[in-house]
Amino acid sequence: METAVAYYKDGVPYDDKGQVIITLLNGTPDGSGSGGGGGKGGSKSESSAAIHATAKWSTAQLKKTQAEQAARAKAAAEAQAKAKANRDALTQRLKDIVNEALRHNASRTPSATELAHANNAAMQAEDERLRLAKAEEKARKEAEAAEKAFQEAEQRRKEIEREKAETERQLKLAEAEEKRLAALSEEAKAVEIAQKKLSAAQSEVVKMDGEIKTLNSRLSSSIHARDAEMKTLAGKRNELAQASAKYKELDELVKKLSPRANDPLQNRPFFEATRRRVGAGKIREEKQKQVTASETRINRINADITQIQKAISQVSNNRNAGIARVHEAEENLKKAQNNLLNSQIKDAVDATVSFYQTLTEKYGEKYSKMAQELADKSKGKKIGNVNEALAAFEKYKDVLNKKFSKADRDAIFNALASVKYDDWAKHLDQFAKYLKITGHVSFGYDVVSDILKIKDTGDWKPLFLTLEKKAADAGVSYVVALLFSLLAGTTLGIWGIAIVTGILCSYIDKNKLNTINEVLGI
């Protein structure tokens, strides 16, 4: 049984009892000796060899161990140096943390334990700072993303609001247009439709005019390009002819010199001519390519010109058809407008008849008849001398005023102070059509203003001057339309009726001024 080594001392192995362990290569030690011829001397020799072998092995092991220890010592020294450098670096980096402690312990050098605690605390603080920095960066990015999302949402909200507002605006316009169309008569709607069709037809013609203009511009450019290319082609063909002539000349020379081709003493001119012919052939081929390319470009330009001319012809035919549609739309619009005008005249006549009936009911048949006569006489009559008309009116007014109190006379001013201009405009348009007044008929804002001023000034001349100005083109019929529409849309009182009639008579028939009071029963 082999004894286990407990430890080594000076390179010698010992067991756990402190005895030296001797290991033999051939058996165990025996004090009586059993080997032949050797006796005790043989055992001693074998023991010495064993001890020597063990010592040799132990030395090797020790050297190995020593080398390992040296390596470990070196590694430890390196680790220590690294630790020291690391410690110094940490100490320097964390000097803000240990400054206070160093100030209190300036008389002594901090121990490694204190530095380790400080380093640990600093590392924890650094970890916390990094954690907070990462958290802050993450929060910042999340906040930026949230802000970006908010801005995008806000922008989208504003876009939706704008779209909503635009939709509401268009809806209001559509509703207003629908309401306006609903209020129109069938004749007026027909005019609207005819106007839209005419506008569409005219727009199509304008569009085709633009297309024709563009095509003509392209055609002109193509023709100029073709003419320029034709000049280039002429030059290229001339160059090709010269190159072909040169090649033919050299080819004939080669043929002429070919009998000497095999004569070493006389073949040099032949080979020189052959070389020159090859060069001339290449030049001729290049010129032919240039001519072919130019002809190709001309053919392409001609094809473009043909295509453009066909397009111009097609658009011109479409334009002619478009012009026909415009003429047709114009005729349809004219018919629709005539139908509308006839309908409006009929309505105006009906409204005027109703107006005369109202006058009959309110002021009697005689006054209604007088109003009709004044209207008929005004047709085609130019405005007379305003001063004469004013003088005749003033004379009638003075007589009339004696029959009415100031309160009665103020009735017309009170009525005009709250006049409804929309109603007045409606009646004015009807009377203008009834009296066949052409051109624009403006409202009587200035007429009302002049009448209202009379209440304070008593001066009627500004009113007569205004009426004269309005009737300068349309004639006295315009004055009739203005004042009849005033009678139809406003309750003026009997004095106001007499005054309005007096103004008309002063312009149309001064003799009737003497009969107004009788007709009205004043």
From Swiss-Prot:
User: InterPro entries recorded for this chain?
Assistant: Channel_colicin_C (IPR000293), Channel_colicin_C_sf (IPR038283)
A GO BP term here is: defense response to Gram-negative bacterium
Q: What does the UniProt entry say about where the protein is found?
A: Cell membrane
Q: Which domain of life is it from?
A: Bacteria
Sorted UniProt keywords: Antibiotic, Antimicrobial, Bacteriocin, Cell membrane, Membrane, Plasmid, Transmembrane, Transmembrane helix
Which Pfam families does its entry note?
Colicin
| Positions with biased composition (Gly residues) | 30-42
Specify where the region named Disordered lies, as residue ranges.
26-52, 136-165
SUPFAM superfamilies reported for this sequence: Colicin (SSF56837)
Task: State the GO CC annotations.
Answer: plasma membrane
An annotated Gene Ontology molecular function: pore-forming activity
Report TM segments. Answer: 471-487, 494-510
Checking Gene3D superfamilies in the record gives: Colicin, Helix Hairpins
Topology in membrane: Multi-pass membrane protein
* Further facts: Plasmid PAO3 is a small colicin E1 derivative.
Q: What job does the chain carry out?
A: This colicin is a channel-forming colicin. This class of transmembrane toxins depolarize the cytoplasmic membrane, leading to dissipation of cellular energy. Colicins are polypeptide toxins produced by and active against E.coli and closely related bacteria.
Instruction: State the family named in the UniProt similarity comment for this chain.
Output: Belongs to the channel forming colicin family.
Q: What is this protein called?
A: Colicin-E1
Species for this entry: Escherichia coli
